[in-house]
């Protein structure tokens, strides 16, 4: 019996695969536990349509990620922060992922999730700082920050 796997089944198949399995195994285990469904013409058509829409969405995300990367790597894209500085040359407050994401949105209209900004430790120094950011899967870039004394 041909089935479409709805979830990964160790040793049998991965989600989205169409495979031939013994009829009893399919009916009594895979289908009952919602791990697979019978591969009818309609079900196969739905699977193909779903895979095409996922590929299209993935391609759109890659294109959007590359556009954001180009914006971030432009020479004029430098996120400016004006912070109060103590006598030791360190800022009173620290600059976090959240602050960087908000300023990027406010100053340049570039929306990046704060969880994708990869700051090792909160920034407390004054000057030019490069912060790595993971835009989408394997698309990475650098945000240029300028922290000024205010």
UniProtKB/Swiss-Prot annotation:
GO biological process, one term: translation
Gene Ontology cellular-component terms listed: ribonucleoprotein complex; ribosome
The keyword Magnesium appears for this protein: no
Keyword terms of this UniProt record: Ribonucleoprotein, Ribosomal protein, RNA-binding, rRNA-binding
Coiled-coil regions listed: none
Superkingdom to which the source organism belongs: Bacteria
InterPro entries referenced in this protein's UniProt entry, alphabetically: Ribosomal_bL9, Ribosomal_bL9/RNase_H1_N, Ribosomal_bL9_bac/chp, Ribosomal_bL9_C, Ribosomal_bL9_C_sf, Ribosomal_bL9_N, Ribosomal_bL9_N_sf
Gene3D superfamilies per record: Ribosomal protein L9, C-terminal domain (3.10.430.100), Ribosomal protein L9, N-terminal domain (3.40.5.10)
Cell membrane is among the record's keywords: no
GO molecular function (one): rRNA binding
A Pfam family of this chain: Ribosomal_L9_C
Cited NCBIfam families: L9
Family under the similarity heading: Belongs to the bacterial ribosomal protein bL9 family.
The protein's role, per its UniProt record: Binds to the 23S rRNA.
PANTHER family according to UniProt: 50S RIBOSOMAL PROTEIN L9 (PTHR21368)
Designated name of the protein: Large ribosomal subunit protein bL9
